């Protein structure tokens, strides 16, 4: 088996390959699948090394395909995310007890057995569970773990700078070719433009996304994650097993405060991102005034955006292309969770590729689009607000519902945040 690894000790553009148990060597631009005129041929190319891309690559490699994964970052790398995974994610990834034990020995893996939920500036409710319903992770560690586990050819530190069609193959960056391309580069995935006719540059993609925000459910978030020293640890009131969720007074978003061992993650996400910095500033001031966090934390907020499943205008397939995760706009509609949809869409994409038997035209990939809609919801055709209650009435009803323990446990947490009503992804589906 040929294995590529990517880490901080690997220079961008280099691939570390391993054959057998202990033979290591550095190569530049070498592929065991095919090498002609400086072009490396693979069975599939994945653009993006997050959970969606690495999961898809892992599944394809296990089925015997020769896969190349490229990412502009060198792993491990920081990633803006609240960072928790539910048991169905562990099941979908087929992580066995030994792998989990090895993971938690050297990485953050914080069991969650409770939540505190409230509307900002109002009294909260604590909901407890007898066993862990989720686990806090650091994307810095988790993504690097999944990428290493994929055991595919890696090109880290290499952004996708060009993409062109040659017959039935895609040629990436002029040197990497494959008949099937998986776009897993997140909300601003460069592959998405070839499916959805978007501008090529990152700045143009962001401008297009800003326009998108006025028509579709684009969520923007600001958040920070950092390690606490002993003094700061004693000043934070959040318990590691019980993240705190704070819903905005207009119910257009929510903030969170989540401690994972010695790490603290704080953030705020909203469906109306136009005044997000102001809302985030007010939220942090509220946390300090409430005594949840001290005022001297090193708070550098970082932003990201994503589309909610069932509202995304993006097409998820093209000729020889599949989009997965946030590139396809699959975040959970109420919580904004992206890791479970990323992992599951990565598995569904791998399954569609394997079932296509080398035929990757749109018709052959159509089952993947249908499966995404079945799993995560099809975009609504009618976006008219006719027949919906006025916002003031909806807000008043929401205030009252948030006071009910039954509603908080079974709707807000079990359904919206933990997805417990959704069955695990069936292997044969």
What is each stretch, according to the model?
Residues 351-429:
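C-terminal helical "tail/cap" subdomain of flavin- and related membrane-associated enzymes
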Residues 40-50:
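Beta1/beta-strand and adjacent pyrophosphate-binding region of the FAD-binding site
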Residues 76-77, 94-114, 201-218, 365:
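A short alpha-helix-loop-beta-strand transition element characteristic
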Residues 53:
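N-terminal Rossmann-fold NAD(P) dinucleotide-binding loop
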Residues 61-80:
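Glycine-rich FAD pyrophosphate-binding loop
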């Amino acid at each position: 088996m040929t294995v590529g690894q990517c880490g901080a000790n690997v220079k961008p553009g280099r691939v570390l390959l391993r054959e057998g148990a202990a033979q290591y060597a550095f190569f530049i631009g070498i592929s065991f699948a095919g090498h002609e005129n400086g072009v490396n041929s693979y069975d599939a190319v994945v653009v993006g090394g997050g959970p969606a891309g690495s999961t898809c690559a892992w599944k394809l490699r296990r089925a015997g395909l020769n896969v190349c994964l490229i990412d502009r970052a060198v792993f491990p790398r920081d990633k803006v995310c609240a960072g928790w995974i539910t048991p169905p994610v562990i099941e979908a990834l087929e992580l066995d007890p030994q792998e989990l034990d090895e993971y938690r020995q050297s990485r953050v893996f914080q069991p969650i057995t409770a939540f505190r939920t409230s509307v900002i500036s109002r009294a909260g409710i604590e909901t407890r569970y007898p066993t862990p319903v989720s686990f806090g992770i650091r994307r810095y560690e988790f993504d690097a773990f999944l990428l290493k586990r994929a055991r595919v050819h890696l090109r880290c530190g290499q952004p996708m700078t060009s993409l062109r069609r040659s017959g039935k193959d895609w040629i990436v960056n002029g040197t990497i070719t494959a008949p099937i391309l998986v776009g897993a580069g997140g909300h601003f995935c460069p592959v998405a433009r070839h499916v959805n006719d978007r501008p090529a540059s990152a700045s143009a993609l962001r401008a297009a996304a800003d326009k998108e925000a006025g028509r579709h459910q684009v969520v923007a978030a600001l958040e920070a994650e950092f390690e606490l020293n002993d003094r700061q640890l004693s000043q934070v009131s959040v318990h590691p097993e019980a993240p705190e969720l704070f819903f905005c007074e207009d119910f257009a978003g929510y903030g969170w405060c989540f401690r994972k061992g010695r790490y603290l993650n704080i953030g705020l996400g909203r469906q109306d991102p136009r005044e997000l910095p102001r809302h985030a500033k007010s939220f942090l001031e509220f946390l300090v005034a409430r005594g949840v966090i001290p005022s001297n934390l090193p708070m550098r907020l970082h932003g990201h955006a994503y589309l909610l499943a069932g509202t995304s205008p993006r097409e998820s397939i093209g000729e020889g292309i599949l989009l997965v995760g946030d590139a396809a706009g699959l975040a959970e509609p109420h919580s904004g969770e992206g890791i479970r949809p990323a992992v599951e869409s990565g598995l569904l994409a791998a399954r569609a590729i394997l079932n296509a038997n080398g035929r990757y035209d749109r018709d052959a990939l159509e089952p993947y689009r249908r499966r995404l809609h079945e799993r995560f919801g099809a975009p609504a055709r009618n976006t008219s607000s006719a027949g919906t209650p006025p916002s003031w009435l909806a807000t008043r009803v929401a205030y009252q519902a948030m006071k009910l323990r039954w509603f908080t446990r079974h709707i807000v947490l079990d359904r919206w945040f933990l997805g417990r009503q959704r069955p695990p992804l069936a292997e044969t589906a």
